[in-house]
Amino acid sequence: MGGFKAESVDQAALASWWTVLNDPTLNQLVEQSLANNTTVKQAMARVTEARARRGIAGASFWPSINASTSGNRSSSDSVLTSDGQIVTGSREIYQAGLDASWEIDLFGGTRRAYESSTAQLGATEADLRDVLVTLLGDVALAYIDVRTTQSRLTFAERNLESQREVVDITGWRAEAGLATSLDVEQAKSSYSQTLAAVPQLESALEAAKNRLAVLTGQTPGSLEGVLGERKPIPVAPAEVIASVPAEVLRRRPDIRAAERRLAAQTAEVGVATAQLYPSLSLSGSIGVNATRTSDLISDGLHSNRYGISLSMPIFRAGALLQNIRVQNALVESAFATYEGTVLSAYEEVENALTSWANEQKRHAALVDSVESARIASELALMQYNSGLVDFQVVLTADRQLISTEDALAVSDGELTSNLIRLYKAFGGGWSVFPPAITQAAAP
């Protein structure tokens, strides 16, 4: 993994950063997670909700029109007329009409409310993109965990074979009187110690596979066919991002969401301020009355009413002014949240860059250490067989080799994982929208 060099961020590469690892299995898992992940589905539903709430706010710009109809029957005692006829006192009246009302947005309260709901929608859409960034990073990291643990298992199993041979050799030497029973028992103990680490690694491997299954919206255990075969850890590319323009970093979804929530809260100040001023409403109705339903259309009695109303708050004991102070305080809080989000983003990027650079140095040292440990282990066993050193030298060299090989496997995975964290810190993948998400994000 030597020869790394830094370059500035490329936005196109940032959008699909996981493809730089050139791993078809990882690409497949990413596609499955985008299509099936339950957290993404929840975020999509919240976008749909926010869009509907903006629609509710937008409806306030328009008049409200209602249709009504009613029928009434009244009766009274029978009356004897002067000509001797008896007339019953029952009467039927039917009514139908339309009522309309419209509150004029004189001082911008409705406009500010719509601006607030629009900004909230933008924040919710940014939250969805943030979910995507987190999901893609989590899927890639879990996948690297799988491959790293598989690599550690491979090292452990290979060392077990070597240690089994050492156990056999010490046994033969003991039978020939060239070694003691202590050597045999120490060899067996070293073998068993390595063997004891295997179940832990197998448990960690299953946990990583199950984590991937859940992230891709599947039941634990369902990815065995995809991940059962051991494959190498994806290698980080020779060129890695070392810098990112500030405008790219500001497009991180969490920063965008904080900025939109600040905008929404700023608009709420306008809503609260508008409540200090008069409100003007227009209203009207048209209707028709008849004694028979058939006459409502052709022979009814028509009526209409129009009106205008003006209301203005006179005394609210300072509640409206206090509400403005509340909204302004919330703006200050939202701005502080925005600033904190930006600072945290820069911190995350700097930490990711530092971790990657330091892991690169550690990895290079471990490569040299493993090479030396392998040579030392071979020499120790040769000298032991020649009677030049005691068995303790073999054990020490063997343990050193096992430790450094395992550390190198972990470093292989950590080097790629740190690159993933770096892309995640840049907000990589926020613009990825598969068909289902694209439909949810459409207006």
Describe the function of each predicted region.
Residues 1-35, 94, 118, 202-250, ...:
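Terminal intrinsically disordered/low-complexity segments used for targeting and assembly
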Residues 110, 126-244, 355, 359, ...:
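Periplasmic alpha-helical coiled-coil/stalk elements that build and connect Gram-negative outer-membrane
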Residues 377-416:
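C-terminal structured "cap/appendage" subdomains that terminate the fold
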